[in-house]
From Swiss-Prot:
NADP(+) binds at residues 129-133, 228, 251. This is Shikimate dehydrogenase (NADP(+)). The active site is at 70 (proton acceptor). The lineage of its organism: Bacteria, Bacillati, Cyanobacteriota, Cyanophyceae, Synechococcales. The keyword Repressor does not apply. Involved in the biosynthesis of the chorismate, which leads to the biosynthesis of aromatic amino acids. Catalyzes the reversible NADPH linked reduction of 3-dehydroshikimate (DHSA) to yield shikimate (SA). One of its GO terms (cellular component) is cytosol. GO terms for biological process: amino acid biosynthetic process; aromatic amino acid family biosynthetic process; chorismate biosynthetic process; shikimate metabolic process. Keywords: Amino-acid biosynthesis, Aromatic amino acid biosynthesis, NADP, Oxidoreductase. Pfam families: SDH_C, Shikimate_dh_N. It is an enzyme of class 1 (oxidoreductase). Homodimer.
Amino acid sequence: MITSNTSFLALIGNPVSHSLSPIMQNAAIKYLGLDLIYIAIPCKNEDLEIVVNSLKKMNCKGLNITIPFKKKVFDLCSEISPVAKKIQAINTLKLKNDNNWSGTNTDIEGFIYPLKNLNLTNKNSIILGSGGAARSVIQGLIDLKLSKITIISRNNNSLNELITLFKNDIKIEGILNTNDEIGNLIEETDLIVNTTPIGMSQTSDNDAIPFGQSSWETIDSNTIVYDLIYNPSPTPFLKFCDRKGCMTIDGTQMLIAQGAKSLSFWTNGLEVPFEVMHDALKKYL
């Protein structure tokens, strides 16, 4: 029951109407018997500082931060975790006792979650896309001790940024999606991760495959293919790779695992029920 004493957690971004976070977070909150509620708050670019600082004065305990604010909230935090500093992205804020925000990033642990029991040490990986999501993926693959990462992208500037950021941590290279060597790379890689929005329900490319179907005809059936998109599930890309005999992973487990880690962060280490969150999403979708 919501009362005047009920605290709240919120997702801040633009847009947030498509987010499934309130569904899974409120299911976990109810299961744990917490006097909390989780809501999504749309925020314009120019209003970010006002909104985030105003929430300090309300009964807000923590925030999730999504596109396009994961870097912009740095200046609003008095404390930032080393991992968030490293990848230059914050997705979770917690209000400290001194009424200032502490920022961290749970996307990396979320990304790793479905890969933890696979032996990827010294394996090679291809990452599709060089946007913000690629940073968490690269750090996750470093943590899993892969030996080499190749990023395929349409944007040379963002490719170079990522290589500069991570070149001291792992063997990493970037190539443009027009490179003739892509077919050979795909044939030889162990893990492919799609971080692009191609295939997402809300995009005009919702029936498309990253860089075109012809790029993937040579994919080996032993390759693991991981698409960060969770709606639709599976994506056209995963359907294609599944028909090729590949092991496929969608973005649902990452979504839940990063959300569970955020809720644990807000509640000082409380064990959060993954399955309860998963069942809530499954029922909704």
